[in-house]
Amino acid sequence: MKNNHTSLKSPLDEEDELKTDHEIDLEKGPLPEYDSEEESTLPPYSDHALVNNPPNTHRENHSYRTTDNSSPLLIKLLISFTSIILFNAPAVCYLKYKDAFFKNYGAAEWTLFGFWCLVCTLALIFLTYFYETWTKAVKVTVISLAKCVKVTAIFLAQCVKACGKGIKHFLKKWENMPMAFSEVFLFNILVGSPRMNLRYIFGDRWGLKCSLADHIIFVVLSILVFIAETVKPGSIRVNLIRKMGYEAKQQVNEYTAVPLREMNPESEA
């Protein structure tokens, strides 16, 4: 069945449409060639293209706006003035302590005070003008000092930890040294106690020689003990309490050990 479609447009309307099709939009430029065979593409300046790609008017409107994150002038002046006050505070406190603040000022003192006020004013202007620069420098300096303090604290903590380990290792390795030196000291007392009798028997000359020999023996024995403990730790230790306790424990285990047959006579059956 054929669909007979008759156009209701007049010839004048068709001529107007042809004219509008051939006219060039001055704002959009000439229309590019449109390939009707490609179904995925749409003709330019179509309504669908305008919906998908709206004009970027929002970006253009905000392109000329610049964000100003700088501090207001009043805050800059306040911070700069506060820094100058803090810088001058020690001098004012010193003059107050000496009771010489605005007292007995002569021409030279007032001239110096005026010059100092001029320097402070110039410093205030300089700090206000270069506010971002010096505040950034102060922040970097504070952060660097904090890092230095942190590194120093970590280093000291590691040093203390290493010293603690060294002392612990030393005490563990040389725990027998006090016992050995106490034995040598006891030997020195036992041998050196009769020095007065030696002097009385052999005279001052031989008694002095015996006394010196006593001290030399003590030093030599101490050095030998130290060398022996260095070469082989525990070789000179005489820990009688531990040794006696260990032997007593062994004897108790030997005498109190009961065979399993006597403890469990039922096991034989």
From Swiss-Prot:
UniProt KW Membrane keyword: yes
Transmembrane spans: 73-93, 110-130, 140-160, 174-194, 216-236
Localization terms from the record: Spore membrane; Vacuole membrane
InterPro entries tied to this protein: WTF
GO BP term, pick one: meiotic drive
Basic and acidic residues compositional bias, start-end: 19-30
Primary localisation category: membrane
Keywords, alphabetical: Membrane, Transmembrane, Transmembrane helix, Vacuole
GO cellular component, one term: vacuolar membrane
Topology class, membrane: Multi-pass membrane protein
Renumbered residue ranges of the record's region Disordered: 1-67
Cited function: Acts as a suppressor component of the dual wtf meiotic drive system, and can suppress but not confer meiotic drive by compatible poisons. Wtf meiotic drive systems promote unequal transmission of alleles from the parental zygote to progeny spores by encoding a poison and an antidote from the same locus; the poison is trans-acting and forms toxic aggregates in all spores within an ascus, wherease the antidote is spore-specific and targets aggregates for degradation by the vacuole.
Family from the record: Belongs to the WTF family.
Subunit comment: Homomer. Interacts with other proteins that exhibit high sequence similarity.
Name used for this protein in its record: Meiotic drive suppressor wtf5
Source organism per UniProt: Schizosaccharomyces kambucha (Fission yeast)
Gene: wtf5
